[in-house]
Amino acid sequence: MHFQEIRRAAAQGTISLPPPANSEGLEDLAVLKSCLKVIRELSGFRYAFAKDAMAETFAPLMASVEAKNELERQGLKVSLKSYFLSLILKDLENPDILLIDNYINALFNSANEAANGPITVQTVVNVVNSFPQDGINWRENPQTDEEQILLQPDTFPDSKAVQVELARWEKYSKELRDLDPLVHALLTNLYFMAISPLNRHNGRVTQILLQLSLMGQNINSPAPCLMLGRALMTNAHFGIEERLYGLRTRQWSPYLQYMLKTLSKAILLSGELLASLQRLYAQTEAYLKMIGLASHAAFLPVIFKHPACRTGEFSSIFTTRRQVASHILNDLARAGILERVEDGRDRVFYHTRLIELLESENYSFSPLPASIDPFVPLYQKGTPGR
């Protein structure tokens, strides 16, 4: 998004704030056509999402991909396999792994609020407080120790100037007037970027706020899991100078067209990722039935929700004996669905195709085996302890 350049231009007074509050001279035909295109694409994605019984499981997985993409856009290299392992070990010491977890929490902790109202200062506070280890505070506030909840819900910045900027931004966010909802969301996001009210990580927070604003009642994105990070990386060829020139002269169309194109790309990528997850689930279910393990298909939702799993966690989820849980996981490993890895005195079972799909550039996964050597499953439906 070239956040630094936009912030610098705003500081130099070359971006006129606040943005327009009505459509006069703002929404030209090209912008309106792009808005209609994006809304149609988002409607299609929302329908595909709504009719999928696994949507609640897939949404956090998709959000983990978005978090990974966004962090890699910032120059960090993170592994989702390591992240999923850290979740079951309850070991989030690695700062990059912790950042993925915080990013996902920031998206989902504010999702319900975002779906029912405008983005506000309270939303900013909720997002920032999802990253306690980063020491984020209001711009120009005294520095405090890290590992604290730095922004209280009813506390505005110490700086009067930042207070005024935030109050004006929130007022703009709440007043839709006759703007197209997408245009309003994008300009509200640009406005936040331009004032940069935080002492650090304004770019990351801006990105999350955009995800949340797209869930608003007038746009209705189904979950905060659009692939915005990757879309921004692939659309970076659109020159910042062209965008800034338009903003300097209050010609907003170049910037809006760029962001609408980015949203369109993000929705396309999100649809592809969702379709790949659906395809892997359906193929895995069909494969289990083909090899005589139809009863094991009932456990697929768990191994999709927990791509790294141990016997203890699996046993707790199904309220069953560890021996039964071990039988199920080992059957799935022998069938080639899971990969069993020794981890000290315990074993970790990885859903390798799912992790491969989430980490690949084109959301692909290795084909399931055409056949396997027959074996007698350790778990049979009706096993004592179930």
Language-model region placement:
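FIC/Doc superfamily catalytic core
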Residues: 1-386
